[in-house]
Structure formats: structure tokens, C-alpha cells
Amino acid sequence: MPVERIGGDAERAIESVLRQEAPFPFELILVSAAPLAIELGTGVRNVIEPNRNPATRRNRAVSEAAGEILAFIDDDAIADVGWLATAVAYFDSHAEALAMGGPDPAPEDSTTAELIAETLLATPLIGSGVACHENRSGIFAIANASDVALVNLFVRKSAFRGFDEAIGYIGEDTSLIVSLLPHVIYHSAVRVFHRRRAFPGPYLRQRWRYRLKTGEMLAQGAAAYSKNLKIKAFLVVGAIAIIAAPITIVPYYVFTLILGVRATRLPVRYWPLLPFAFAAHHATYFAGIVWGWIRAKLG
């Protein structure tokens, strides 16, 4: 678990791991740039890595890990009490599985702004298009590397090839997962609760950075992106919607409202605002991908 500072969400994240109902021993490795102001109990270590590249930090933590299965979680996420036990039980009974992820819904104490962000990510067809953000049910092998996320990821240590430190922040987990397909499993009972960035400002800034990286990876021909039909379909539909905006506005409002209310946990009074939030979300995605692609091509 990469940790910048102790307090708030980080303390809850650490506590959620230490309170796991697991019938086996495990260790928690906290990786930080400087020693953390926390009393380390049994089974907890603080590994120091001054380099703030998240791929470098996680690789450093893995180099110190003694377990056969690596579990990755962020310091703003809370693990379900059976998180470790469920994942390990599946690995024990399925030797072919090399990696696993699961849903990462927002916690129950989320603010209205955070629940708007969750709705934008969780709505099928028009949201993120990512299984773990959509909180899908079931157990299945994923076909798209982005269907699991680093906030909730397990990898057999024997199969771990390292996060690509050249990619750095955003995309380093996708690169690793691609190398492990088709042996990556989505398991809906392997669950963490992940704090969302508040909408609009923090959320849209984060999504902009993510989609810039998507555009850059597309321009570089990375397979996980260039072969992703969802990205291509989104760009085509987005371009058509922009050109035909005068006649698509009303259908867009109705369509996003219907789908959004089916996925949201927001009170009813906020529902009419969802289409406007989706418009900002989609515009950020489209512009970010296009600008990231242009920027990469120019140099």
C-alpha cells in the first residue's frame, strides 16, 4: 500500500487490512517516501522509496514481500473483511489464475459530489466501461485489461513481471495485466470501497489526466489501447454527437438520465442534474484522448 501521510482515509485503509478475517498469516507493506509517523505492529512494515513514481514504489514493495500472492490496495480504499480470504481461496482452487481483481464501489459515507462521480463511472454503456467501476456481479476471466484496477488487484508473485516504470502513473497496471491475459479473473466478492474524487473539479481533473494517458498510449500503438473497440466506438460516437449537437441534445438528456438513475445512489432530487454531469464527463474524456494523441504525435 503506497502511503503519503498518516491520517483520515489512510488510517482506515490500514485498519481494514489488519482486520481481515483470514485463516492464514499475511503481512502489510506500507511504502512511502519517508518514515511514517505510525507505530508498526506485528506483520506491518514500512518500506522507504524516495522515488514518487508509483510503479517504482510498488516494485520496491514487491521486492520486499515474502508472500506467494501479492495484494495491491490504495491508501484511500477500505477492504471488505473477507477480501484476502476470498481471493486466496480462489487462487488455491484455480491454479490457472494468475491475477484477480474485483469491484471498487464508493464507501457508504461518500458525499453527494463523490456519489455523482461514482454514478459517472458505474453507469453501464455511458460510464467508464470498466467492470470493477460498474460493480458487476459474477466470476469471469476478463478480456479487457482495464476491467480490473490497481486499487484492488491480486497477482501471484511467481507471475509478477513488474510494473513498467517508464509508464509511471496511469497505465502501469494495465500494462502488467495485458501480459497476464487470459489468466486474469474478475471476482465480485473480492471487494474494496474506494473513495471517489469529488465532482466536478477534482473528478474532472483526474479524468483529464487519465484520458491524456489513453491518447498517448493510442498514439504509441499500445495493444491494450489500440485494440480496444470501446475507445474507438466512443471517439466515433463523440464526433458524431458534436457535429449533430442540435438534434442530439434532447435524446442525449433522456438517454443519460434513464441509464444514470438505474446506477446511482443519489437522492431523487439530484437525478435531473445527471445528464449535465455526463456531458462534462464525456467532453473531458473525448478532449483528453484527442489531445493526448495529438501531443504524443507532435513530440
Language-model-detected regions and their locations in the chain:
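Conserved donor NDP-sugar-binding/catalytic core segment of glycosyltransferases
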Residues: 3, 81-119, 123
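Glycine-rich, basic loop-to-helix element that forms the pyrophosphate-binding segment
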Residues: 49-65, 86
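Catalytic donor/gating beta->alpha subdomain of glycosyltransferases that bind UDP-sugars
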Residues: 166-222
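Short, acidic, metal-binding catalytic loop of nucleotide-sugar glycosyltransferases
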Residues: 12-25
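A recurrent flexible, glycine/aromatic-enriched loop bordering the glycosyltransferase active site
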Residues: 127-154, 166-169, 175, 192-195, ...
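Basic/Trp-rich segment in TM-proximal cytosolic loops or flexible interdomain/linker regions
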Residues: 198-248, 266-268
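Short aromatic/hydrophobic "clamp" motif used to bind/position activated sugar donors
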Residues: 70
